[in-house]
Amino acid sequence: MAEGGEREELLSPPPISPAKRLCSWPSPQAHHPRGTPGAAGGGAGGGGGGCLAPGARPHLQPESLLDCAAKTVAEKWAYERVEERFERIPEPVQRRIVYWSFPRNEREICMYSSFQYRGGPGAGAAAGAAGASPVEEGPPPPPGAAAPAGSAPGAAGAGSSPGLGAGTGTASGGCGGGEGLPFRRGIRLLDSGSVENVLQVGFHLSGTVTEPAMASEPAVTYKVAISFDRCKITSVSCGCGNKDIFYCAHVVALSLYRIRKPDQVKLRLPISETLFQMNRDQLQKFIQYLITAHHTEVLPTAQKLADEILSSNSEINQVNGAPDPTAGASIDDENCWHLDEEQVKEQVKLFLSQGGYYGSGKQLNSMFAKVREMLRMRDSNGARMLTLITEQFMADPRLTLWRQQGTSMTDKCRQLWDELGALWVCIILNPHCKLEEKSCWLQQLQKWSDLDICPLEDGNYGHELPNITNALSQSASHSPDSLSRPRRTVFTRAIEGRELHWQDSHLQRIISSGIYTAPACQRENERLLFNSHGQPLWLEHVPTACARVDALRSHGYPKEALRLTVAIINTLRLQQQRQLEIYKHQKKELLQRGTTTITNLEGWVGHPLDPIGCLFLTLTEACRLNDDSYMEMSDMNESRLPVYQHVPVASGCPNSNESYLSLALEVALMGMGQQRVMPEGLYAQDKVCRNEEQLLSQLQELQLDDELVQTLRKQCILLLEGGPFSGLGEVIHRESVPMHTFAKYLFSALLPHDPDLSYKLALRAMRLPVLENSSSAGDTSHPHHMVSVVPSRYPRWFTLGHLESQQCELASTMLTAAKGDTLRLRTLLEAIQKHIHSPSLIFKLAQDAFKIATPTDSSTDGTLLNVALELGLQVMRMTLSTLNWRRREMVRWLVTCATEVGVRALVSILQSWYTLFTPTEATSIVAATAVSHTTILRLSLDYPQREELASCARTLALQCAMKDPQSCALSALTLCEKDHIAFEAAYQIAIDAAAGGMTHSQLFTIARYMELRGYPLRAFKLASLAMSHLNLAYNQDTHPAINDVLWACALSHSLGKNELAALIPLVVKSVHCATVLSDILRRCTVTAPGLAGIPGRRSSGKLMSTDKAPLRQLLDATINAYINTTHSRLTHISPRHYGEFIEFLSKARETFLLPQDGHLQFAQFIDNLKQIYKGKKKLMLLVRERFG
């Protein structure tokens, strides 16, 4: 990294001479109290803080030459080198160097004390676009070369305004956007005056911070110590015992006190300087007073050191000089911010152990954002922190478990791994890293990648994307197999980055100057490097080129990233124009065939490197209005929408009026409109959808002004005319990723400005080719052709349900917008009927159209209402022969919709019922609702209209009864009861069907209806037929048909003796349950027959005898049923049922005693039981006790 080793110095030092004082070499132990000496990484830039830099003079009073020199030396040189370089350093110079060595930028304190940071990620880019940033005026150095002086940390200069060149922060919210964050709490402690006793001795700052008293806790004072070097905090110590990745609030408070109130801090030179000025007596007095003040702590150590010093052979006497913890770092020490590595490991391990919970994923994403923030500040701790995070990820025990079980990781975990891999690509493509650093990272990445548990790039699927550095041109001819690569892990793309470099002269010119144009006299090999306007092109695999942009942007080169982005977009434009020309030559042939095998194997949306998202963010950050009050604390958790402005593109073309914002919109549209084949695997397909939604949410933040609308319209026309190369072309590959979600955004954005274009585009996007009939494979000789890998309809489209729902959302959006426009609604209806294949989704659209057409506060839209009805009718036809759990709801809704349309719609569905409904639905729901009193009132029908509806309903009822008498006979009778002829026909249908497949319950139901309507003889006939279909076993005493049997017997009894005599043989034949038979017998003997008979018949007035016909037959059957049931129950009876059995015999005796000789018959029956079942002694004892 930039600060990972010494760069070009301000002065060229002569050969190192011995130090002027041997008692001032720094102590590593003192600098690293937590045991992390020499931590890898580096520090952030020292740009100015949110307030005036410490000791800075008013604007009109320039800094003194001493301060200017001291600031630079304090930032660039270790103090030991200063001492070695100059034999004598005046005390005022020493004081200014020590003074300026403390960090000057509050942002850096915030970065190490908070996950969140509100510094406007586009700060650097915006400044770079305006040409105001003092950072990186030249191109980034190639890997391994020394970076320019301006690229080192703090190159922005101590006096530069916040955000210029060093603006970072990828997480939303304020620096400490929550009350509990250390940075926020540190500011509160500082503002409340809790920081006291601040003392700076050389490169060591100390003080006390008092936590105010709480309701249940007293005030507590903590001692805080901070060591620093070259504008970086190198170690911290606090009495609170904080265990976290970030600095505690007390360290923050002390640091901010030093930044904001430097003049109130007591400043002393390093303690070795003070000791050097003392004579022997003063030194002795100093030591003795020091020991006296802290004798309990330091006396043993003091005596030990004294013994060693007095011993001539001791190790301490073999070394010149003595350590000084306040003298700053040594030359050999790495200059980096303090980062508690152990806490980073512990925190990541803790978050991973929490599984896929939302909170842990959010925290890990915040850590990734912190890495990006460090990278942009060019802080080498970014790479070190990412290494620590990756080590813990690779140590996650779930990786082994998932591999052993053959299961895939969760989506949330997969997304974290993707971000990890993307960050490593940024690290490897760092334009200012050293070759040895890059080599070290690559070795570690290769080691991780070689492990069996290392996650693969796109799951367990073999089809891979092209290699990052050897990606083939999109116009090359390749089959899927030829693009397959060996096992690719999440680190493979970063490892492939070893082949990329920054030394290409054309690339260097692109990123070094915004006005780089084609030379007047071009050589043969230079003609392809520029477009017709002389603007430079960058002809590289698009995702790889975008990875370069991300690396530049991530490492604090905003202007360079913008320049390369513009070159990439010019290249994409040229490619788009060439594809249009190719399509024009093949348009006629493709339209005749109606199909194509041309496709892009690699999509930019959902790509692991997120090329479109990278370009879009780079461009929009250049246009984002920054909030200068980045240090203000916000108690509001909601994030505010960003505000953008047009920033002109720095271009060598004088007539170019483009802005970065319009380019951002254009490249997003080009990327999402790219035709690409659906990738393999659930995760890859889900990632396509998720990435598209992310890009669209970012697009929706743009306020479309005239310039952006013009860009939008132009790009939409190009997409429509793009043929098979555009996802919105006329003919596309059958497996192309659908454009529904994208088209919905385009439709909504374009509608107020160009309705015709918006509808044309949205209607084109409605298709879902993979569900439509495939045609012939076509000509495979074209370089873009790819034979379909979907032999059947859609075997590998795991996200098909989501895609269909997005298709439905697009149609619903158009329906809402087209309200009142008959022609557009008719066109849209045809598109829906052609392209949407899910009945549930069409039903949803029909419901949406119905709601829009029938608002509660305005008149009904008849055209849209008819569209709703048409969609409903299509749903009925689609689901008529299939199972759908919402079918009844759909039928009821359709009748409601037809009612709203009018009586002609109801008549139409009644007349064509057989194409829409099952017989049961037609009679029980459709016809019944159509002729209901509610419908008549709703439509205010006159008599002829009511009769027409009723006639249609009767015709429907008879047709349904003929087709399905079992289910529709009763409904047909109900619908026809007001028309004698139709009623007779329905009754005859029921009688004819009785001998067929109708069940006893259906016949009993119809019979009861006939009795209710006043047709008892017809009811008796149907009941008799029902009895012939019934069979009640001896133990079915709770059968649901018992009530029907009792009702039938009561009906026959009420009609007269003859009807009862006709029914009893049927009862005896069908019913074998003794209790039911005895109940029937009892009921028949209670009243005389014919009491409730039909008019004209008279009752005999005499009760019927059980000894005579027809009851004698029923009595004998009942007694036999009791006998048979008794024997059946005794076969498997248990003691707990003895009491129940005795009660059963008691009921049986009541029936036995009805005839004159019944008591003898019952006694004989009991004796037989005692003889047959004498082995059941306890039971027989109970029988004797009850019955003798």
Curated annotation (Swiss-Prot):
GO terms assigned for molecular function: zinc ion binding
UniProt biased composition (Basic and acidic residues): 1-10
Keywords: Metal-binding, Zinc, Zinc-finger
InterPro entries for the chain: Znf_SWIM, ZSWIM4-8_C
Domain of life: Eukaryota
Biased composition, class Low complexity, residue ranges: 126-136, 146-155
Region entry Disordered, spans: 1-46, 123-171
Transmembrane intervals: none
Zinc finger (SWIM-type) boundaries: 222-259
Comp. bias (Gly residues): 156-171
Name recorded for this polypeptide: Zinc finger SWIM domain-containing protein 5
Organism of origin: Mus musculus
